[in-house]
From Swiss-Prot:
EC number in record: 3.1.1.31
Key words of the record: Carbohydrate metabolism, Glucose metabolism, Hydrolase
GO cellular component: cytosol
HAMAP family: 6P_gluconolactonase
The organism of origin for this protein: Salmonella paratyphi B (strain ATCC BAA-1250 / SPB7)
One Gene Ontology MF term: 6-phosphogluconolactonase activity
Reactions listed under catalytic activity: 6-phospho-D-glucono-1,5-lactone + H2O = 6-phospho-D-gluconate + H(+)
Protein name: 6-phosphogluconolactonase
Family: Belongs to the cycloisomerase 2 family.
Pfam families: Lactonase (PF10282)
Plastid recorded as keyword: no
Length: 331
Protein backbone atom coordinates (compact mmCIF):
# COMPACT_ATOMS: atom_id res chain seq x y z
CA UNK A 1 0.00 0.00 0.00
CA UNK A 2 1.29 3.43 -1.02
CA UNK A 3 0.31 6.44 1.05
CA UNK A 4 0.45 10.14 0.25
CA UNK A 5 0.10 12.96 2.78
CA UNK A 6 -1.22 16.37 1.69
CA UNK A 7 -0.75 19.48 3.85
CA UNK A 8 -2.45 22.82 3.18
CA UNK A 9 -0.68 26.08 4.10
CA UNK A 10 -2.96 29.06 3.44
CA UNK A 11 -0.52 31.84 4.37
CA UNK A 12 1.90 30.74 1.62
CA UNK A 13 -0.93 29.41 -0.62
CA UNK A 14 0.64 25.97 -0.99
CA UNK A 15 -0.12 22.28 -0.84
CA UNK A 16 2.82 20.05 0.06
CA UNK A 17 2.65 16.48 -1.26
CA UNK A 18 4.52 13.85 0.73
CA UNK A 19 5.15 10.13 0.35
CA UNK A 20 4.72 8.24 3.65
CA UNK A 21 6.66 4.98 3.93
CA UNK A 22 6.11 2.01 6.26
CA UNK A 23 8.62 3.38 8.78
CA UNK A 24 6.76 6.67 9.16
CA UNK A 25 9.22 8.75 7.13
CA UNK A 26 7.96 11.49 4.82
CA UNK A 27 9.59 12.31 1.47
CA UNK A 28 8.60 15.48 -0.37
CA UNK A 29 7.08 14.76 -3.79
CA UNK A 30 5.68 18.12 -4.89
CA UNK A 31 4.85 21.66 -3.78
CA UNK A 32 1.73 23.06 -5.45
CA UNK A 33 1.15 26.80 -5.64
CA UNK A 34 -2.58 27.32 -5.15
CA UNK A 35 -4.52 30.33 -6.55
CA UNK A 36 -5.78 31.42 -3.15
CA UNK A 37 -5.53 30.68 0.55
CA UNK A 38 -6.05 26.92 0.67
CA UNK A 39 -7.61 25.50 3.81
CA UNK A 40 -9.91 22.45 3.92
CA UNK A 41 -9.12 19.39 1.80
CA UNK A 42 -10.66 15.97 1.19
CA UNK A 43 -9.82 13.02 -1.07
CA UNK A 44 -12.59 11.66 -3.29
CA UNK A 45 -13.98 8.22 -2.39
CA UNK A 46 -12.37 6.70 -5.50
CA UNK A 47 -9.02 8.29 -4.50
CA UNK A 48 -8.61 9.96 -7.90
CA UNK A 49 -9.17 13.59 -6.87
CA UNK A 50 -8.26 16.01 -4.11
CA UNK A 51 -10.88 18.69 -3.42
CA UNK A 52 -9.74 21.88 -1.70
CA UNK A 53 -11.47 25.05 -0.56
CA UNK A 54 -9.84 28.43 -1.21
CA UNK A 55 -10.43 32.09 -0.41
CA UNK A 56 -10.76 35.10 -0.79
CA UNK A 57 -12.43 34.13 -4.09
CA UNK A 58 -14.56 31.36 -2.60
CA UNK A 59 -14.14 28.23 -4.70
CA UNK A 60 -13.71 24.49 -4.55
CA UNK A 61 -10.78 23.29 -6.65
CA UNK A 62 -10.34 19.75 -7.93
CA UNK A 63 -6.88 18.26 -8.50
CA UNK A 64 -6.23 14.94 -10.23
CA UNK A 65 -4.09 12.59 -8.17
CA UNK A 66 -1.34 10.75 -10.05
CA UNK A 67 -1.67 7.01 -9.31
CA UNK A 68 2.08 6.43 -9.12
CA UNK A 69 3.25 9.10 -6.67
CA UNK A 70 0.19 11.11 -5.58
CA UNK A 71 1.26 14.29 -7.38
CA UNK A 72 -1.46 16.83 -8.18
CA UNK A 73 -2.65 18.37 -11.45
CA UNK A 74 -5.38 21.03 -11.52
CA UNK A 75 -8.60 19.77 -13.12
CA UNK A 76 -11.61 22.01 -12.39
CA UNK A 77 -13.18 24.56 -10.06
CA UNK A 78 -16.61 25.74 -8.94
CA UNK A 79 -17.80 28.83 -7.05
CA UNK A 80 -18.94 28.64 -3.42
CA UNK A 81 -21.44 30.81 -1.48
CA UNK A 82 -19.07 31.50 1.41
CA UNK A 83 -15.53 31.17 2.70
CA UNK A 84 -14.81 27.41 2.94
CA UNK A 85 -14.09 26.21 6.47
CA UNK A 86 -14.62 22.46 6.03
CA UNK A 87 -15.04 20.21 3.00
CA UNK A 88 -16.24 16.62 2.67
CA UNK A 89 -17.98 14.32 0.19
CA UNK A 90 -20.72 11.74 0.27
CA UNK A 91 -19.53 8.14 0.18
CA UNK A 92 -20.53 7.61 -3.46
CA UNK A 93 -18.58 10.56 -4.83
CA UNK A 94 -21.63 12.42 -6.14
CA UNK A 95 -21.56 15.55 -3.98
CA UNK A 96 -19.16 17.88 -2.16
CA UNK A 97 -20.32 19.47 1.10
CA UNK A 98 -18.76 22.75 2.26
CA UNK A 99 -19.35 24.39 5.62
CA UNK A 100 -18.68 28.12 5.96
CA UNK A 101 -18.11 29.56 9.43
CA UNK A 102 -18.19 33.20 8.33
CA UNK A 103 -21.22 32.87 6.04
CA UNK A 104 -23.08 30.58 8.42
CA UNK A 105 -24.10 28.13 5.72
CA UNK A 106 -23.54 24.68 4.30
CA UNK A 107 -23.54 24.10 0.54
CA UNK A 108 -23.82 21.08 -1.75
CA UNK A 109 -21.94 20.98 -5.07
CA UNK A 110 -22.69 18.25 -7.59
CA UNK A 111 -19.83 16.20 -8.99
CA UNK A 112 -19.75 14.79 -12.50
CA UNK A 113 -17.03 12.28 -13.35
CA UNK A 114 -15.27 13.45 -10.19
CA UNK A 115 -15.31 17.15 -11.08
CA UNK A 116 -17.38 19.91 -9.40
CA UNK A 117 -19.94 21.23 -11.88
CA UNK A 118 -22.75 23.11 -10.11
CA UNK A 119 -24.08 24.31 -6.79
CA UNK A 120 -27.31 22.46 -6.00
CA UNK A 121 -28.26 23.60 -2.48
CA UNK A 122 -27.37 26.07 0.27
CA UNK A 123 -28.75 26.05 3.82
CA UNK A 124 -28.38 29.34 5.70
CA UNK A 125 -28.69 30.48 9.34
CA UNK A 126 -26.15 28.00 10.66
CA UNK A 127 -24.16 30.43 12.80
CA UNK A 128 -20.55 29.35 13.01
CA UNK A 129 -21.06 26.34 10.73
CA UNK A 130 -17.80 24.43 11.13
CA UNK A 131 -18.16 21.08 9.38
CA UNK A 132 -20.46 18.84 7.34
CA UNK A 133 -20.35 15.12 8.12
CA UNK A 134 -22.21 12.41 6.22
CA UNK A 135 -23.25 9.33 8.19
CA UNK A 136 -21.78 5.96 7.20
CA UNK A 137 -25.07 4.97 5.52
CA UNK A 138 -24.85 8.10 3.31
CA UNK A 139 -28.30 9.25 4.40
CA UNK A 140 -27.86 12.01 6.97
CA UNK A 141 -25.61 15.08 7.05
CA UNK A 142 -24.59 16.28 10.52
CA UNK A 143 -23.74 19.99 10.54
CA UNK A 144 -22.36 21.53 13.76
CA UNK A 145 -23.30 25.21 14.21
CA UNK A 146 -20.65 26.29 16.69
CA UNK A 147 -22.15 29.63 17.72
CA UNK A 148 -25.59 28.08 18.33
CA UNK A 149 -24.44 25.05 20.36
CA UNK A 150 -26.36 22.71 18.10
CA UNK A 151 -25.82 20.02 15.48
CA UNK A 152 -28.31 20.22 12.62
CA UNK A 153 -29.49 17.04 10.91
CA UNK A 154 -30.38 16.86 7.22
CA UNK A 155 -31.50 14.01 5.00
CA UNK A 156 -29.53 13.94 1.74
CA UNK A 157 -31.91 13.55 -1.20
CA UNK A 158 -30.99 11.72 -4.40
CA UNK A 159 -30.52 15.02 -6.22
CA UNK A 160 -28.31 16.52 -3.52
CA UNK A 161 -30.80 18.68 -1.64
CA UNK A 162 -30.75 18.84 2.15
CA UNK A 163 -34.05 18.24 3.95
CA UNK A 164 -34.31 18.96 7.67
CA UNK A 165 -34.97 15.82 9.68
CA UNK A 166 -37.37 15.41 12.59
CA UNK A 167 -35.96 16.28 15.03
CA UNK A 168 -34.00 18.81 12.98
CA UNK A 169 -31.23 19.32 15.54
CA UNK A 170 -29.64 18.22 18.79
CA UNK A 171 -28.11 20.57 21.33
CA UNK A 172 -24.82 20.51 23.19
CA UNK A 173 -24.37 22.14 26.58
CA UNK A 174 -24.36 25.93 26.46
CA UNK A 175 -20.99 27.35 25.46
CA UNK A 176 -19.55 24.08 24.12
CA UNK A 177 -19.18 25.16 20.49
CA UNK A 178 -19.47 21.91 18.45
CA UNK A 179 -16.86 21.90 15.68
CA UNK A 180 -15.59 18.71 13.97
CA UNK A 181 -16.88 15.12 14.02
CA UNK A 182 -15.96 11.53 13.23
CA UNK A 183 -17.96 8.29 13.17
CA UNK A 184 -17.05 4.95 14.74
CA UNK A 185 -16.43 2.13 12.22
CA UNK A 186 -19.39 0.20 13.66
CA UNK A 187 -21.71 3.04 12.52
CA UNK A 188 -23.45 3.27 15.89
CA UNK A 189 -21.56 6.18 17.49
CA UNK A 190 -20.28 9.61 16.52
CA UNK A 191 -17.78 11.83 18.33
CA UNK A 192 -17.81 15.64 18.25
CA UNK A 193 -15.04 17.90 19.52
CA UNK A 194 -16.32 21.11 21.08
CA UNK A 195 -14.08 24.12 20.44
CA UNK A 196 -15.04 26.50 23.23
CA UNK A 197 -14.89 24.17 26.24
CA UNK A 198 -12.44 21.59 24.80
CA UNK A 199 -14.65 18.58 25.43
CA UNK A 200 -15.69 15.58 23.35
CA UNK A 201 -19.29 14.38 23.11
CA UNK A 202 -20.23 10.79 22.30
CA UNK A 203 -23.46 10.53 20.29
CA UNK A 204 -25.32 7.26 19.90
CA UNK A 205 -27.18 6.65 16.64
CA UNK A 206 -30.19 4.89 18.14
CA UNK A 207 -32.03 3.91 14.95
CA UNK A 208 -31.88 4.32 11.14
CA UNK A 209 -34.32 7.26 11.24
CA UNK A 210 -31.85 9.72 12.71
CA UNK A 211 -32.69 9.52 16.42
CA UNK A 212 -29.51 10.26 18.38
CA UNK A 213 -28.57 10.78 22.01
CA UNK A 214 -25.50 12.14 23.79
CA UNK A 215 -24.29 9.33 26.05
CA UNK A 216 -20.99 10.79 27.30
CA UNK A 217 -19.16 14.12 27.54
CA UNK A 218 -15.49 14.03 28.43
CA UNK A 219 -13.08 16.87 29.21
CA UNK A 220 -10.03 16.64 26.95
CA UNK A 221 -7.73 18.94 28.94
CA UNK A 222 -5.29 18.17 31.76
CA UNK A 223 -6.70 18.83 35.24
CA UNK A 224 -4.29 21.71 35.87
CA UNK A 225 -5.03 23.56 32.61
CA UNK A 226 -6.42 27.06 33.31
CA UNK A 227 -5.90 28.98 30.06
CA UNK A 228 -8.41 29.66 27.27
CA UNK A 229 -9.79 26.46 25.77
CA UNK A 230 -9.53 26.26 21.98
CA UNK A 231 -10.05 22.75 20.60
CA UNK A 232 -9.75 22.15 16.87
CA UNK A 233 -9.74 18.69 15.29
CA UNK A 234 -10.69 15.07 15.99
CA UNK A 235 -9.90 11.72 14.32
CA UNK A 236 -10.31 8.01 15.04
CA UNK A 237 -8.13 5.08 13.99
CA UNK A 238 -9.53 2.79 11.27
CA UNK A 239 -10.03 -0.04 13.80
CA UNK A 240 -12.01 2.26 16.12
CA UNK A 241 -9.77 1.59 19.13
CA UNK A 242 -8.16 5.02 19.57
CA UNK A 243 -9.49 8.57 19.28
CA UNK A 244 -7.47 11.79 19.22
CA UNK A 245 -8.41 15.47 19.63
CA UNK A 246 -6.22 18.58 19.69
CA UNK A 247 -6.26 21.92 21.49
CA UNK A 248 -4.51 24.94 19.98
CA UNK A 249 -3.87 27.00 23.12
CA UNK A 250 -2.18 24.12 24.92
CA UNK A 251 -0.55 22.75 21.73
CA UNK A 252 -1.40 19.21 22.70
CA UNK A 253 -3.14 16.12 21.37
CA UNK A 254 -5.34 14.22 23.80
CA UNK A 255 -5.26 10.43 23.48
CA UNK A 256 -8.47 8.48 24.14
CA UNK A 257 -9.13 4.76 24.20
CA UNK A 258 -12.50 3.67 22.83
CA UNK A 259 -14.56 0.85 24.31
CA UNK A 260 -15.17 -2.15 22.07
CA UNK A 261 -18.71 -1.07 21.22
CA UNK A 262 -17.71 2.58 20.77
CA UNK A 263 -19.90 3.95 23.56
CA UNK A 264 -17.27 4.98 26.13
CA UNK A 265 -14.11 7.07 25.85
CA UNK A 266 -11.28 7.12 28.39
CA UNK A 267 -8.40 9.61 28.47
CA UNK A 268 -5.08 7.77 28.18
CA UNK A 269 -2.64 10.67 27.94
CA UNK A 270 -1.59 14.01 26.48
CA UNK A 271 0.98 14.52 23.74
CA UNK A 272 2.72 17.92 23.38
CA UNK A 273 2.87 18.79 19.70
CA UNK A 274 3.54 21.55 17.18
CA UNK A 275 2.55 25.11 18.14
CA UNK A 276 -1.17 25.74 17.63
CA UNK A 277 -2.21 22.42 16.05
CA UNK A 278 -5.09 23.42 13.77
CA UNK A 279 -5.39 20.08 11.99
CA UNK A 280 -4.09 16.53 11.98
CA UNK A 281 -4.95 13.16 10.50
CA UNK A 282 -4.28 9.43 10.81
CA UNK A 283 -2.88 7.24 8.06
CA UNK A 284 -4.92 4.41 6.57
CA UNK A 285 -2.99 1.70 8.43
CA UNK A 286 -3.79 3.32 11.77
CA UNK A 287 -0.09 3.33 12.61
CA UNK A 288 0.83 7.00 12.17
CA UNK A 289 -0.64 10.39 13.11
CA UNK A 290 0.45 13.56 11.30
CA UNK A 291 -0.14 16.94 13.01
CA UNK A 292 0.22 20.45 11.58
CA UNK A 293 1.44 23.39 13.67
CA UNK A 294 -0.17 26.59 12.44
CA UNK A 295 2.38 28.70 14.34
CA UNK A 296 5.42 26.43 13.98
CA UNK A 297 5.08 26.05 10.17
CA UNK A 298 5.99 22.38 10.60
CA UNK A 299 4.25 19.03 10.62
CA UNK A 300 5.14 16.20 12.97
CA UNK A 301 4.73 12.46 12.44
CA UNK A 302 3.89 10.25 15.42
CA UNK A 303 3.74 6.49 15.70
CA UNK A 304 0.63 5.17 17.46
CA UNK A 305 1.93 2.66 19.98
CA UNK A 306 0.72 0.09 22.50
CA UNK A 307 -2.72 -0.80 23.73
CA UNK A 308 -3.30 2.78 24.92
CA UNK A 309 -2.55 4.35 21.55
CA UNK A 310 0.07 6.73 22.95
CA UNK A 311 2.14 8.78 20.50
CA UNK A 312 5.88 8.59 19.83
CA UNK A 313 7.38 11.28 17.60
CA UNK A 314 9.10 9.93 14.47
CA UNK A 315 10.09 13.20 12.81
CA UNK A 316 9.12 16.76 11.95
CA UNK A 317 9.19 18.58 8.63
CA UNK A 318 9.03 22.19 7.47
CA UNK A 319 6.03 22.98 5.28
CA UNK A 320 4.47 26.23 4.07
CA UNK A 321 3.32 29.11 6.24
CA UNK A 322 0.45 28.54 8.66
CA UNK A 323 -0.38 24.88 7.87
CA UNK A 324 -3.97 24.09 8.77
CA UNK A 325 -5.09 20.85 7.14
CA UNK A 326 -3.76 17.31 6.69
CA UNK A 327 -5.25 14.49 4.61
CA UNK A 328 -3.89 11.05 3.78
CA UNK A 329 -4.58 9.01 0.64
CA UNK A 330 -3.85 5.29 0.25
CA UNK A 331 -3.75 3.52 -3.10
Amino acid sequence: MKQTVYTASPESQQIHVWSLNHEGTLTLVQVVDVPGQVQPMVVSPDKRYLYVGVRPEFRVLAYRIAPDDGALTFAAESALPGSPTHISTDHHGRFVFVGSYNAGNVSVTRLQDGLPVELVDVVERLDGCHSANITPDNRTLWVPALKQDRICLFTLSDDGHLVAQEPAEVNTVEGAGPRHMVFHPNRQYAYCVNELNSSVDVWQLKNPHGEIECVQTLDMMPADFSDTRWAADIHITPDGRHLYACDRTASLITVFSVSEDGSVLSVEGFQPTEAQPRGFNIDNSGKYLIAAGQKSHHIAVYEITGTQGLLTEKGRYAVGQGPMWVVVNAY
